Amino acid sequence: MKEKFLRELADIQTGPFGSQLHKEDYVADGTPIVTVEHLGNKMFSEQNLPRVSNTDKNRLKKYVLKQGDIVFSRVGSVDRCSYVDQKHDGWMFSGRCLRVRPTREIDSEYLYYYFCLEETKQFVRNIAVGATMPSINTKLLGEVVVTFPELEQQKRISGILSAIDSKIEVNQKINDNL
């Protein structure tokens, strides 16, 4: 097993600041923007997504998500995160979020599941600053120590966990229809 700081395994980016993107920039049809409210268990909630035009998307291209990215809440529930799958590739993330883009040294799904561990979530909550509203930034998140095996084993682990998540999702849909 290896150990490295997250900053050594991923590019960590804060979302656009308020001066870069305003509510007036939102359009009815366009590229969806993930906000803290849309972070769920692995997947994003797709309800009431703000959207921006292609012009704004091109202007703010460093905030465009790619498959394999992990999006974190920067304020409030700082231990919440979601995984960017193929369906959400090309979406954007808001200023109240942080985007983690893993290097090739670590499997992105393995890293996502690592952040789902209760001990990792607790560590993130503990490093947050702010008495009334906890918050994290790129520097603080980069201080998380990640323990990981060889890449092949990471992929096996994340494959098993992803298959379990898929079965849970199917069961939830069945239960919703009862």
Model-predicted regions and their roles:
Residues 30, 48, 94-96:
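A generic structural signal for short beta-strands and their flanking turns/coil linkers
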Residues 90-98, 106-109, 129-158:
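A short glycine-rich beta-alpha junction/loop motif
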Residues 35-36, 54-118:
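A short beta-sheet element
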Residues 1-17, 143-177:
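Non-catalytic DNA-recognition/assembly elements of restriction-modification systems
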Residues 7-23, 37-67, 87:
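Sequence-specific dsDNA recognition surfaces
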Residues 23-25, 32, 117-146:
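Specificity-determining recognition surfaces
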Residues 39, 77-78, 129-130:
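Short glycine-enriched loops at secondary-structure junctions
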